[in-house]
Curated annotation (Swiss-Prot):
Family affiliation: Belongs to the UPRTase family.
GO molecular function: GTP binding; magnesium ion binding; uracil phosphoribosyltransferase activity
Annotated binding of uracil, by residue: 194, 199-201
Enzyme class: transferase
E.C. numbers: 2.4.2.9
Protein name, per record: Uracil phosphoribosyltransferase
Amino acid sequence: MGKCQVISHPLIQHKLSILRRQDTSTKDFRELVNEIAMLMGYEVSRDLPLEDVEIQTPVAKTVQKQLAGKKLAIVPILRAGIGMVDGFLSLVPAAKVGHIGMYRNEETLEPVEYLVKLPEDIDQRQIFIVDPMLATGGSAILAVDSLKKRGAANIKFVCLVAAPEGVKKLQEAHPDVDIYTAALDERLNDHGYIVPGLGDAGDRLFGTK
């Protein structure tokens, strides 16, 4: 079973509390999502493998460490996942970015996929799926399904806020996928929103309703 790790760094928790506020502006919301994503990036990349490499400094030759193994890919679930991409790219600017587009059927609460655009070598990459919220788990499961159909095997799911119901469903559907979140909230309400949550992340990021 994949782990679900709550990243409780003080800076992340402070920024998340501001993000949740109803009166946080679109501009501030967008900036906070980017900042929290960057801070989370340090934690979710903690186990990336390193290798020795010989370099020449201005003074002498020396053996130092650099990232080894698989290259990285950031895959946001559209729309809201876009807000987390730049935070990750500020840490790993060479990472490729794919996109998986989905919308939620408001009657069934089930996700509907409308776009999949991925790097050609996605099967050779360590993948971070990013989406601010893990609610029912439907979008996350469908995103992992789409990636695995294309040969991807090393996948992590990164969100800002998760509901226990979504975590459980994703772990049951894909026990090999680790989940990283800044908060594990109480529950889902009857409309499939996380409580206390932060509202509709996509609308708050882009100033839409």
